[in-house]
From Swiss-Prot:
Location(s) in or outside the cell: Cell inner membrane
Species assigned in the record: Xanthomonas campestris pv. campestris (strain ATCC 33913 / DSM 3586 / NCPPB 528 / LMG 568 / P 25)
InterPro entries to which the protein is assigned, alphabetical: CcmE (IPR004329), CcmE-like_sf (IPR036127), NA-bd_OB-fold (IPR012340)
Name used for this protein in its record: Cytochrome c-type biogenesis protein CcmE 2
Highest taxon above the source species: Bacteria
Any GO CC annotation of this UniProt entry: plasma membrane
Source lineage: Bacteria, Pseudomonadati, Pseudomonadota, Gammaproteobacteria, Lysobacterales
Membrane topology: Single-pass type II membrane protein
Transmembrane portions of the chain: 9-29
């Protein structure tokens, strides 16, 4: 093999290795920052992972909101119609946050409580993220009872 071909071969190998390394680093960075969306029922079944960072989607349960006196710390429950999960958040809540409204919170589970780092609220229940609507819809369909048959 002549020196020019050998140099080209080393250059091609170096480029392939650099491309592979760059792809690996990008994939690792993306995987670390991905937060999957789960409903309360899925979290309680253990699908989210014990120490994983994830998004929790559902509706703020009516009558569940309370705020610690003299503090920003808020406590509320998120429900998907199937299960409820307590949430703790210690920052300023969005202006659109209300009981009975759709919410998506990002955070981690700690001792049975979802500790939110970020909370997004929707202005009414007619719009919610497609993933949350689909998951809540399946929970609601699961609980519907077939109409009774009338016998004569």
């Amino acid at each position: 093999m002549n020196p020019q071909r050998r140099r080209r071969l080393w250059l091609v190998l170096a480029l392939v290795l650099a491309g592979g390394l760059a792809t690996t680093l990008v994939a690792m960075a993306l995987q670390r920052n991905v937060a999957y969306l789960y409903t309360p029922a899925e979290v309680l079944r253990g699908e989210a992972g014990e120490h994983a960072r994830f998004r929790l989607g559902g509706m703020v349960e009516k009558g569940s909101f309370r705020r610690e006196a003299g503090s920003l710390e808020a406590h509320f429950r998120v429900t998907d119609g199937d299960a409820q999960l307590p949430v703790r958040y210690d920052r300023i809540l969005p202006d659109l946050f209300r009981e009975g409204q759709a919410v998506v919170a990002t955070g981690r589970m700690q001792q049975g409580v979802f500790v939110a780092e970020d909370v997004l609220a929707k202005h009414d229940e007619t719009y919610m993220p497609k993933e949350v609507a689909d998951k809540m819809g399946s929970a609601h369909r699961k609980h519907q009872v077939a109409p009774a048959k009338v016998t004569q």
